[in-house]
A protein has these predicted regions:
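Hydrophobic anchor residue at the start of the ABC signature
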Residues: 141-142
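Catalytic Walker B motif of ABC-type/P-loop ATPase nucleotide-binding domains
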Residues: 152-156
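Conserved ABC transporter NBD signature motif
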Residues: 51, 55-63, 72
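Conserved ABC ATPase "signature" region
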Residues: 106-124
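Conserved catalytic motifs of ABC-family nucleotide-binding domains
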Residues: 83-92, 101
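Conserved ABC ATPase signature
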Residues: 127-135
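Helix-to-loop junction immediately C-terminal to a conserved catalytic motif
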Residues: 47
Length: 209
């Protein structure tokens, strides 16, 4: 199977070098590295939020610098550590994020399926200002998933969750990604989650394993 994402000789800010990497559809890859190794910056390089000093990122065989940034960021979705939700209901947040990215919004059934995948146990009409930090994080992940990305970049997706909820969420997300051919790249400081769910790990301080 062809790689959906491939990096070559990437350098950021002329000082952070990254290993070459290939990721295939449906593959679950966890990234490792100490603080300061540039894990979050690596994700921003992969979806074109920032540009490398040197090297290339290929998405489906094309240099991402040749791809419309809005289109790229709908297909290579970055769910960062900060989960921002607009005022209003969960449903309204789905609609606003899709409007913001100039994307056709999902129907209610599709929204609910994404909420279920992210273990969100309440309705689309729930006001977001009543949610806890962990609940907001899961809604934010569900919205990101609703764009049906080809590549899902997950930066500490369970940071606001307790251990049991974190494991259940990762079980759902990894199953969803495998079943739908979504390549998932995950940064997590939780060693248990890495050992349990990673099909492969990449050390940003060295070579892939």
């Amino acid at each position: 199977m062809e790689a959906v994402l491939r990096t070559s000789s990437l350098v950021f800010l002329d000082r952070i070098s990254y290993p070459d990497m290939e990721v295939r559809p449906g593959e679950i890859v966890f990234l490792r590295g100490p603080s300061g190794s540039g894990k979050s910056s690596f994700f921003r390089l992969l979806n074109g939020t920032v540009s490398p000093s040197r090297g290339t990122v290929l998405y489906r065989g094309r240099d991402i610098l040749e791809i419309d940034p809005l289109l790229l960021r709908r297909e290579v979705i970055l769910a960062g550590q900060s989960a921002y939700l607009f005022p209003g209901t969960v449903r309204e947040n789905f609609l606003q994020y899709h409007q913001y990215r100039d994307s056709d919004p999902p129907d209610s059934e599709s929204m609910q399926a994404c909420l279920d995948a992210c273990r969100v146990p309440f309705s689309l009409d729930t006001p977001c200002d009543t949610l806890s930090g962990g609940e907001k994080q899961r809604v934010f992940l569900a919205i990101a998933l609703s764009f049906r990305p080809a590549v899902f970049l997950l930066d500490e997706p369970t940071s606001a969750l307790d251990g049991a909820t974190a494991e259940a969420l990762m079980a759902n997300l990894t199953e969803y990604c495998r079943n739908h051919g979504v390549a998932a790249l995950v940064v997590s400081h939780d060693r248990h989650l890495t050992e349990k769910f990673a099909e492969r790990t990449v050390d940003l301080g060295g070579a892939a394993s």
